[in-house]
């Protein structure tokens, strides 16, 4: 198979694509892959590091308000469509897969115009503007949340889950749990100021609880709090770090997750059957993180603490209410396992094979 994948801007569009490619290579080792992104997006660093060929087009996001910049964006869109067509005529893909982000717009649009089989994957519960635009033009639509199905034509939409779920589930298959109940608190790669402030407030109480807390502040914040963190560095119930490098292994060993509710995070957490306390970021488009988390709250796999209600007391109460209540923990664990999609890459692969044939 020859496949072009496009998607970028944030890790939520890139990491699912790379997880799928890893599975695809296992199934079809001779697969030829080309990734199309932008020079300034996160994909420009992540994709080459993964050993995947990257080509770029020059595109920028559309402003949601009236702006002269949108004229420039429109010009760049059609220029990128033209550039993408040239790349495709040279590479000759059997299928083109878009995973979201504004770069996917002109690339998948170009493929559809060239009559190349196309599929998009929507990772969030509320679709982004790019995938809503592409929905009528592509052959298949894969979604990571059941809530997203209502926004797309039912006859070509399938629930697959997020490919990161299968990658995490496979990697964690042989990992044993910590003996001491453990919660992982993580505010994303850069950290979250509100979460850091709540954690500082909660430290005296967390230090004496029956469970262990592994906390990542984010590298840009760690030095600001180091003096306080150092007061607790000998406490066996606390493991405080700037960043978590081995997140998959750590989550697999732990019993609970507390943090933001990005689509990839939720896929990883449910693939491992972890209960979760989600604190949706208020700084994302269309309040996507709240919508993401709500689907799993409705299934009994998670609870939500609103960002504006997060403080030391609410943080400790949310954790202890789950980890110190065996019956509630087990109910949430079962719900999380049921909600997880540990075969997400296989499901997406089946759709890709269907249209590429």
Curated annotation (Swiss-Prot):
Enzyme's top EC category: transferase
Keywords for the protein's UniProt record, in alphabetical order: Cell cycle, Cell division, Cell membrane, Cell shape, Cell wall biogenesis/degradation, Glycosyltransferase, Membrane, Peptidoglycan synthesis, Transferase
Family: Belongs to the glycosyltransferase 28 family. MurG subfamily.
Catalytic activity: Mur2Ac(oyl-L-Ala-gamma-D-Glu-L-Lys-D-Ala-D-Ala)-di-trans,octa-cis-undecaprenyl diphosphate + UDP-N-acetyl-alpha-D-glucosamine = beta-D-GlcNAc-(1->4)-Mur2Ac(oyl-L-Ala-gamma-D-Glu-L-Lys-D-Ala-D-Ala)-di-trans,octa-cis-undecaprenyl diphosphate + UDP + H(+)
GO biological process, one term: lipid glycosylation
A single GO molecular function term of this UniProt record: undecaprenyldiphospho-muramoylpentapeptide beta-N-acetylglucosaminyltransferase activity
Topological type in the membrane: Peripheral membrane protein
Pathways involved: Cell wall biogenesis; peptidoglycan biosynthesis
SUPFAM superfamilies associated with the record: UDP-Glycosyltransferase/glycogen phosphorylase
Localization annotation: Cell membrane
CDD domains recorded: GT28_MurG (cd03785)
Keyword Ribosomal protein: no
Entry binding sites for UDP-N-acetyl-alpha-D-glucosamine: 10-12, 124, 189, 244, 289
Gene3D superfamilies, sorted: Glycogen Phosphorylase B
InterPro entries assigned: GlcNAc_MurG, Glyco_trans_28_C, GlycoTrans_28_N
UniProt-recorded name of the protein: UDP-N-acetylglucosamine--N-acetylmuramyl-(pentapeptide) pyrophosphoryl-undecaprenol N-acetylglucosamine transferase
Function: Cell wall formation. Catalyzes the transfer of a GlcNAc subunit on undecaprenyl-pyrophosphoryl-MurNAc-pentapeptide (lipid intermediate I) to form undecaprenyl-pyrophosphoryl-MurNAc-(pentapeptide)GlcNAc (lipid intermediate II).
Superkingdom per UniProt: Bacteria
EC number: 2.4.1.227
CC annotations in GO: plasma membrane
């Amino acid at each position: 198979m020859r496949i072009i994948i496009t998607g970028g801007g944030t890790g939520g569009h890139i990491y699912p694509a790379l997880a799928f490619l890893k599975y695809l290579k296992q199934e079809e080792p001779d697969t030829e892959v080309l990734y199309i992104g932008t020079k300034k997006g996160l994909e420009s660093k992540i994709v080459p590091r993964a050993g995947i060929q990257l080509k770029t087009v020059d595109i920028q996001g559309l402003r949601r308000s009236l702006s002269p910049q949108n004229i420039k964006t429109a010009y760049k869109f059609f220029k990128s469509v033209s550039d993408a067509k040239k790349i495709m005529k040279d590479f000759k893909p059997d299928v083109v897969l878009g995973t979201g982000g504004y770069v996917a717009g002109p690339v998948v649009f170009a493929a559809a115009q060239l009559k190349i089989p196309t599929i998009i994957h929507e990772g969030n519960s509320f679709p982004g503007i790019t995938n809503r635009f592409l929905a009528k033009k592509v052959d298949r639509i894969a979604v990571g949340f059941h809530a997203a199905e209502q926004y797309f034509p039912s006859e070509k939409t399938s629930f697959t889950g997020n490919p990161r779920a299968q990658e995490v589930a496979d990697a964690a298959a042989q990992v044993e749990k910590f003996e001491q109940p453990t919660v992982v608190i993580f505010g994303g790669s850069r950290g979250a100021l509100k979460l850091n402030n709540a954690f500082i407030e909660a430290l005296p109480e967390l230090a004496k609880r029956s469970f262990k807390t592994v906390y990542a502040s984010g590298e840009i914040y760690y030095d600001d709090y180091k003096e306080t963190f150092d007061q607790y560095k000998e406490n066996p119930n606390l493991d405080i770090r700037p960043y978590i490098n081995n997140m998959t292994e750590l989550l697999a060993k732990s019993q609970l997750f507390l943090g933001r509710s990005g689509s990839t995070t939720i896929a990883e957490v449910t693939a491992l059957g972890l209960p979760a306390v989600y604190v949706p970021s208020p700084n994302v488009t269309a309040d996507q993180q709240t919508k993401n988390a709500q689907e799993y709250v409705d299934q009994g796999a998670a609870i939500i603490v609103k960002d504006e209600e997060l403080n030391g007391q609410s943080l400790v109460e949310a954790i202890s209410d789950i980890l110190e209540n065996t019956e509630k923990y087990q109910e949430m664990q079962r719900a999380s396992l049921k909600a997880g999609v540990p075969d997400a890459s296989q499901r997406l692969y089946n759709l890709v094979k269907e249209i590429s044939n």
